[in-house]
C-alpha cells in the first residue's frame, strides 16, 4: 500500500509515515510549529538557513518554500533523512535543499544515534562509530550564501552544537532558534551567546524554542 501524500502551503507535498507526531499537523494541511515558522517567515528572508535536527523535513520544507535561497538539512538518522529527501523530491525543492547526514557537536568526529523514544526525533547522540559528527563551523564550506537563520533541535546536544559555531556566529551573525529544555541549558546558551553579542528575545512552544538575535555590531 502506497504512503498517503498531503499538500501543505507553498506547493509542498509530503508523505505520511508512522509514527505521526508532527505529521498530525500535516494531515490538517498545516506545518508543525506553525507560530514559530510564521515568525521566521515574517522577519527573515534570503541567504542560507541551517536546519539542525531536520528530522523528516517540516522546517526544511517551509524554509525552502517561503524563506531561504538555500537550506542545509542536517539530520543523522538514516530513516528520517530518507523521509525528508522523499518530501523534498515530491515538492520539487532539490535545488534549494542540501542534505547533510550527520549529527552536530562541538568537534567533528563519529558517534551513534540511540533511539530514546517512539517519535522520529527522539534519538540521542552517544559514543560510537555509526554516524558522522560535524560542527556548524564546518558547514560553512557548504553554504552558498551568508547564513541568515540557524534552527537547532538536536536532542540535548544544542549546547555542544553552539560550542562548534564560533566562526559562523562571528562571520554571519545569524538569528538562532534553539530548543532548550532545562534552565541549565538555557543558562549555558546565554553564557555562550552573550559574549558574541546575542540577546535572547522570544520563546515559542511547549518544548521551548528560544530566539536569539545579534544585538550589537
Where are the regions a protein language model picked out?
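Conserved SAM/SAH-binding loop
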Residues: 102-106, 135-136
Amino acid at each position: 500500500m502506497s504512503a498517503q501524500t498531503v499538500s501543505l502551503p507553498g506547493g509542498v507535498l509530503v508523505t505520511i509515515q508512522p509514527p505521526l507526531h508532527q505529521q498530525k499537523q500535516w494531515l490538517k494541511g498545516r506545518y508543525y510549529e506553525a507560530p514559530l515558522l510564521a515568525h521566521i517567515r515574517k522577519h527573515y528572508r534570503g541567504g542560507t538557513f541551517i536546519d539542525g535536527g531536520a528530522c523528516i523535513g517540516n522546517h526544511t520544507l517551509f524554509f525552502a518554500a517561503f524563506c531561504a535561497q538555500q537550506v542545509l538539512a542536517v539530520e543523522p538518522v538514516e530513516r528520517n533523512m530518507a523521509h525528508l529527501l522523499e518530501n523534498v523530491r515530491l515538492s520539487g525543492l532539490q535545488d534549494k535543499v542540501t542534505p547533510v547526514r550527520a549529527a552536530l557537536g562541538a568537534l567533528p568526529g563519529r558517534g551513534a544515534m540511540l533511539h530514546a523514544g517512539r517519535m522520529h526525533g527522539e534519538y540521542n547522540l552517544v559514543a560510537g562509530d555509526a554516524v558522522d559528527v560535524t560542527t556548524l563551523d564546518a558547514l560553512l564550506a557548504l553554504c552558498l550564501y551568508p547564513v541568515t537563520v540557524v534552527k537547532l533541535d538536536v536532542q540535548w546536544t544544542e549546547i555542544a552544537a553552539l560550542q562548534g559555531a564560533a566562526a559562523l556566529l562571528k562571520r554571519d551573525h545569524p538569528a538562532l532558534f534553539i530548543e532548550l529544555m532545562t534552565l541549565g541549558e538555557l543558562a549555558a546558551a546565554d553564557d555562550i551567546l552573550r559574549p558574541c553579542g546575542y540577546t535572547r528575545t522570544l520563546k515559542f512552544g511547549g518544548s521551548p524554542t528560544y530566539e536569539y538575535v545579534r544585538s550589537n555590531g
